[in-house]
Amino acid sequence: MELIQDTSRPPLEYVKGVPLIKYFAEALGPLQSFQARPDDLLISTYPKSGTTWVSQILDMIYQGGDLEKCHRAPIFMRVPFLEFKAPGIPSGMETLKDTPAPRLLKTHLPLALLPQTLLDQKVKVVYVARNAKDVAVSYYHFYHMAKVHPEPGTWDSFLEKFMVGEVSYGSWYQHVQEWWELSRTHPVLYLFYEDMKENPKREIQKILEFVGRSLPEETVDFVVQHTSFKEMKKNPMTNYTTVPQEFMDHSISPFMRKGMAGDWKTTFTVAQNERFDADYAEKMAGCSLSFRSEL
């Protein structure tokens, strides 16, 4: 019981104005000593935007499409989560020590909190953005099952918090826009979750080109097949069922829940949708990013 008392529902902590899970905020100090390498590859997303999906795609690419090699460890061990920290589990920095080059790394950090070494080394970044409505709904369910977050409250109150950036990692609007801006000056492949759902093979080809690798077409098809939502949901190396229940309670909501575009329509009321759209138009004014909220 000690572990549960220690981990359950701590309030968010603000770092440079960004709200973070308490343990992740504590990890930022040690993270400053992190040294990036030019052959590192960073996977960056706002939470609930397809991070695990693109991580598995990239690990399969790095392993030449060998599924057995991708079963060597859970995804969070194969692709260290830089700012991860929780009692009784190896931190992202600790996992990193045992990761051979070339390394795949994962973060949800906004640019203000990103270790400068990643930018100095011009580390390539694969960024995935997902439409805000589906992110908000998915995040609400994730808050329920991942007990390192505060209580999510009602859907209506959570949506309000999401709109003003008072959820872990702060504003979705700022996150997607600042990484989009960075793509003009830094090697960033900016992908959209909805494009990946619509045509995964096309998007995987983009990733291959970006990382300077090639695979035979039948291997690419194999990667598409084994990184489908259906396959990843039942794969213990990708579905987070190996994480202790004190941290993630899959009986509340599975980590891999629906993995679709447009599911927000089952949750948003008409009034919530109208309010969200008006606020969205204001926050995204002048931004050239365009999202599809359904397929």
Swiss-Prot record:
Gene Ontology CC terms, in alphabetical order: cytoplasm; cytosol
GO molecular function: 3'-phosphoadenosine 5'-phosphosulfate binding; aryl sulfotransferase activity; flavonol 3-sulfotransferase activity; steroid sulfotransferase activity; sulfotransferase activity
Subcellular location: Cytoplasm
EC number(s) recorded for this UniProt protein: 2.8.2.1
Catalyses which reaction(s): a phenol + 3'-phosphoadenylyl sulfate = an aryl sulfate + adenosine 3',5'-bisphosphate + H(+); 17beta-estradiol + 3'-phosphoadenylyl sulfate = 17beta-estradiol 3-sulfate + adenosine 3',5'-bisphosphate + H(+); 4-ethylphenol + 3'-phosphoadenylyl sulfate = 4-ethylphenyl sulfate + adenosine 3',5'-bisphosphate + H(+); 4-nitrophenol + 3'-phosphoadenylyl sulfate = 4-nitrophenyl sulfate + adenosine 3',5'-bisphosphate
Tissue specificity field: Liver, lung, adrenal, brain, platelets and skin.
Chief localisation class: cytoplasm
Result when mutating residue 249 to G: Increased activity towards p-nitrophenol
Residues bound to 3'-phosphoadenylyl sulfate: 48-53, 130, 138, 193, 227-232, 255-259
Outcome of swapping residue 70 to S: Increased sensitivity of enzyme activity to heat inactivation
Binding-site positions, substrate: 106-108
Keyword Lipid metabolism on entry: yes
Active site positions: 108
Pfam families: Sulfotransfer_1
Highest taxon, organism lineage: Eukaryota
Modified residues (Phosphoserine): 138
Keywords attached to this entry: Catecholamine metabolism, Cytoplasm, Lipid metabolism, Phosphoprotein, Steroid metabolism, Transferase
Oligomeric and partner information: Homodimer.
Entry's family note: Belongs to the sulfotransferase 1 family.
Role, per record: Sulfotransferase that utilizes 3'-phospho-5'-adenylyl sulfate (PAPS) as sulfonate donor to catalyze the sulfate conjugation of a wide variety of acceptor molecules bearing a hydroxyl or an amine group. Sulfonation increases the water solubility of most compounds, and therefore their renal excretion, but it can also result in bioactivation to form active metabolites. Displays broad substrate specificity for small phenolic compounds. Plays an important role in the sulfonation of endogenous molecules such as steroid hormones.
Stated name of the protein: Sulfotransferase 1A1
Organism encoding this protein: Homo sapiens
Gene expressing this chain: SULT1A1
